[in-house]
Swiss-Prot record:
FAD binds at E39, G53, R113, D313, G326. Coiled coil: none annotated. It comes from the Eukaryota. This is FAD-dependent monooxygenase atnK. It comes from Arthrinium sp. FAD-dependent monooxygenase; part of the gene cluster that mediates the biosynthesis of the meroterpenoids arthripenoids. The pathway begins with the HR-PKS atnH that catalyzes two chain-extension steps to form a reduced triketide, which then primes the SAT domain in the NR-PKS atnG to initiate three more cycles of extension to give a linear hexaketide corresponding to the polyketide part of arthripenoids. It is a multi-pass membrane protein. The active site is at R200. It holds the Pfam family FAD_binding_3. Its cofactor is FAD. It is found in: Membrane.
Amino acid sequence: MAVIEKRPDFKVVIVGGSISGLVLAHSLHQAGIDYIVLEGRNRIDPQIGASIGLFSNGSRILDQLGVYKSILDLTEPLVWYDMLTGQGDLVRRDDSLRLIEARTGYPVAFLERRQVLQVLHKHTPDQSKILTGKKVVSVRTLADGVEVQCKDGSKFTGDIVAGADGVYSRIRREMWRQAKSDGGLKHLEDDVKAMSADYRCLYGMSYPVPGLRKKSLYRTFNKDWSFLVVVGKDECCFWFVFEKLNGTHKLSNMPTYTESDQAEFVKPFMKRYVSQGVAFEALWHRKTAATLAALEEAQYNHWTYGRFVCLGDSIHKMTPNIGQGGNWAIESAAALTNKLHSLMKTTRQPTTEQISDTLIEYEQSRQVRTKEVCTTAGFATRLEAFEKFWHRPMALYVVPLAGDMLVDVHCQSVAEAPKLDFLPPPELSLKQDTIFQAVQFDQQGPHLVSRVLRATPLLALCFAAFHCLEPTGSAVPANADTEAVRLAMLSYLGDFFPIQVIAMVESARRGNSMGIAGLWPLFGLTGYWGSTGYAVPVYFFLQYILSPPSRYAASDNRLVPTHYARSAVAATGVGYLLLVAYGVLSQQNYLAGYAYWYLLPACTAVVHPLFASFLTHTTFADRVQNPRADMKYLLLSYAISGVFSGITHVYTWAPSPWGLGNILLIAARLRQGALLLEEMGPEKLIQRHHILMLGGGLFWALLHLWDLKSTGRLKAGWFKVLGALGGMLVMFGPGTALVLGWAWREVVLARKTGPH
């Protein structure tokens, strides 16, 4: 790995040989920035029973630094995730941890914290720059730098001092002292009072325990306490026992514990279950190390002042329930190095003001993201301990039914994580189908505001339809049973078939779960009471603005469960047949029967799951092993619906509404109020509905293709796109053109984007 030329005229004094401190040292080395690490303990890797969970946001940076493989050799990737009640009853078991690896390229892994420290220390290019037994007692600001004094009397100078010295950071306190002396930070007292603890935790490690599966993570939820157990390499068990304290403790009365306190603490937990058949006592009797400590929480406003800067637990302390504390420390080390590297490109001898501005940029780049994760971690701790009355039903019933939603949230967060910008991204992060690979495209796409503005014509169609079309169920004349009306209805229903198939596919797509796509039947029912001319364009508008390509950055989120993909056309066909049969039996005229077709989305919403239930459900395996398993079924569904629409279009060519005269007539009449049934004729009314709905559909498809063009994923030029869709529109009608555009989108979204 190439190292940037050294600049010995700028030096960082890193206080703390923690994970954040050593990662910062490695990062600065790669950036060509001089440093020295001062660790207060006599060894870099003390054994205190602490473990660390590595997720992709931290692993990717370690990979850039060339140390990840050595760390990975000490772990065994996790696969299984069990959620249990305090009585040991299984709430949910899934392989979400394997799905995270499939999406990110990096496995979720646990190992001893000291093992990570050992690897980082071993791979340090110049170990003479890592000094132990150097407990810092004060920092003095000089005219052109800082002077750090240690307890043994030694002093070290540099341009800045970085506090990576943990939750009770000396550097943070020295920064506060300096700021208070200068009167330089607003609301400093808020930071001084920020730390608190509502929970305590006994954490440790144990030898293998019979009954605990390899590659598994167990969570047990109960009122006021919870367990977290992870089975790592060689079946070594890492465990946490969380318990709510009696009230909130601030820094002044933060509890501390001795080894004798542990024995008293564990008594009520010994018979409580950590898995379906294993009680905590099995872990306790096989423990190799354990520590009891308060779970401090703190989100500080000020991360830097002058030549001081903090990172890791010294400035963002979260509870360990989501396993992101160490990863966030690694992120902050990378983010700080990025800013310093950018500064070094402009000057090798920056002024105090330039240094201060750079460190403030680092602070601002991290605060929003860090506040979110600290809040999430604290919420997880409280949720698992049922702190609020609604936490129990949410943890035991809502979360288990949410499917892979938690994986979605996690992956969205890590996809936005910083890396070392001056080093190439590691190959593992850019392999086929990872979110890091896909996000390179999708970050270039349009933001929400521009998406709303781009989709505004769909709302204009809705407005036009609402004011210029009357519901088809009103004032049905006696002459509605004519050949012209029949052909107009047939043309309309032929083109509606692809829309219905597409809507059913989108409602079943994994990335659209709990989204607007699932409400398609409601938009159909709205049309029953009014007009699809204004109901469907609203659906198009909402679906577009809420479904950017990034929603499907994970390839399994593009996936449509195969049992739904295989049955979409059949369900739509049966829905058509049921409504045809109803119209025949009720002996309605064509126009009155037309109103019943607004029931089609609701009808197929019932038929589709019924049909799918008779087919093999392979989603659990497909989402990890074969996220393109649905493609042949989707393309077949699109082809069948396109052919059906094209045949009806050709058959009804003479009364087709897509002539220039009809379209110009609508434009002219929009200024004249409602297009009343009595004055235009029933077949014309159907045709106007047809134009507004299918015109919106074609524009909707073009918007999605526009997204793919703007992100660089669709390579075809606009001449080719518009030529293909326009040619299909002329020859086989709008329904066929629409489904062609949608199939094109499907192929692009499913295309392998990583190196292969």
